[in-house]
Amino acid sequence: MARVKRGVQARRRHKKILSLAKGYYNARRKVFRVAKQAVIKAQQYAYIGRKQKKRNFRSLWIVRINAAARMNGLSYSRFMNGILKCGITLDRKMLADIAVHDPAGFTALAEKAKTMLAA
C-alpha cells in the first residue's frame, strides 16, 4: 500500500486558516497553531456578537420609544399597553424610527394610546 503524505491538503488547510487570520498581530497571523486558535476564538466571538446585536438593538429601540413617550406624558409600559389596546401593530423597530424621524406622527400615536387608556 502506498504511503499518503497529505502535503497538498495540509498546505490548503494551513492557507485557509492563515488567510482567515489576516489583520491579526504577530504570531496570531504567521504561526499556524496560534492562528488556528485565534480564528476559532474570533468565530466564537462573532457568533456571540450576532446574538448580542439583536438584544442591543431591541434595548436601543425601547430606550428611544421610552424617551419619546415620556415627552408625551406616558411611560413606556403605558404607551405600549395603549398601542396594543388600539390595535396598532407596529413593532418596536418601527416605533423607534417614527419617534426619531417623525415626532409629530409619534405624538399622534401617543394621543391614541392615551385615549384608549382613559376609556
From Swiss-Prot:
Claim: Amino-acid biosynthesis is one of the keywords in the record: no
PROSITE patterns on file: RIBOSOMAL_L20
GO CC list: ribonucleoprotein complex; ribosome
One MF annotation (Gene Ontology) recorded for this entry: rRNA binding
Superkingdom in the source lineage: Bacteria
Keywords for this protein: Ribonucleoprotein, Ribosomal protein, RNA-binding, rRNA-binding
Keyword Glycoprotein in annotation: no
Name of the molecule in the record: Large ribosomal subunit protein bL20
Lineage, highest ranks first: Bacteria, Pseudomonadati, Pseudomonadota, Gammaproteobacteria, Lysobacterales
